[in-house]
Design a protein with these regions (language model features):
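Hydrophobic anchor at the beta1->P-loop junction of P-loop NTPases
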Residues: 31
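Extreme N-terminal, non-catalytic leader segments
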Residues: 1-28
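Conserved substrate/cofactor phosphate-moiety recognition/catalytic segment
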Residues: 44-89
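Small-molecule kinase domains that catalyze NTP-dependent phosphoryl transfer to phosphate-bearing small molecules
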Residues: 131-134, 139-187, 195-196
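Conserved beta-strand scaffold positions in the cores of enzyme catalytic domains, especially
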Residues: 59, 125-129, 171-173
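Conserved lysine of the Walker
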Residues: 39
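ATP-dependent NMP and nucleoside kinases share a basic, alpha-helical "lid"
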Residues: 68-75, 91-149, 156
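The conserved Walker
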Residues: 35
């Protein structure tokens, strides 16, 4: 890693200054689970609920990240790791600005999720495992990815041709095939409110 020879951190406004301005604390809510499990759907519900309560938040997901800053990455193991590393670094900036950050990424291994937790900081990281079974995710298949993976058109597809490790350290586990969306959103919103106020 290249050393920054002109560090300015000691002259920047502090995290506390920014959180005081917003009247909230920053936190990273890291949603993990298979494609189609409901990560983004639950996160969007949480975002709407937090917004209605005057809480500033931002969703980071594969669509908005891979279309921009990570558009040069593929799906090899190395690229997936770099994808999550960059997301965690960006998310850390949001969190340190006092923003509730909702990150929705498959992030299929415990190592990769632990890396994100270390980058963001354990005290600012809440891991949410959307544990919807693969059969339900495949039934939903909103983007047609499971069908393409089954035909061999998508390589390294988590759950089909690449493994997904159940999280070792999830703070919350939600199966969206059993728990209604409204209940999932309420559970997470209440948990977040308790952490940031």
């Amino acid at each position: 890693m290249t050393e920054n020879i002109y560090p300015i951190y000691d002259r920047m406004m502090s995290r506390e200054d920014k959180e005081s301005l917003l009247g909230q604390k920053g936190i990273m809510i890291w949603f993990t689970g298979l494609s189609g499990s409901g990560k983004s759907t639950v996160a969007m519900g949480v975002e709407r609920e937090l917004h209605a309560r005057g809480i500033l938040c931002r969703i980071l997901d594969g669509d908005n990240i891979r279309a921009g800053i990570n558009n040069n990455l593929g799906f090899s193991e190395e690229d997936r790791t770099e994808n999550i590393r960059r997301i965690a670094e960006i998310g850390k900036l949001f969190v340190q600005t006092g923003i509730v950050t909702l990150a929705c990424f498959v992030s299929p291994t415990n190592d990769i999720r632990n890396m994100a937790r270390e980058i963001v900081g354990k005290e600012d990281f809440l891991e949410v495992y959307i544990s919807t079974p693969i059969e339900e995710c495949e039934r939903r298949d909103v983007k047609g990815l499971y069908a393409r993976a089954r035909r061999g058109e998508v390589k390294n597809f988590t759950g089909i041709s690449a493994p997904f490790e159940k999280p070792d350290h999830a703070d919350v586990s939600i199966d969206t095939s059993i728990i209604p969306l409204e209940e999932s959103v309420k559970q997470l919103t209440d948990l977040i409110i308790d952490r940031i106020k």
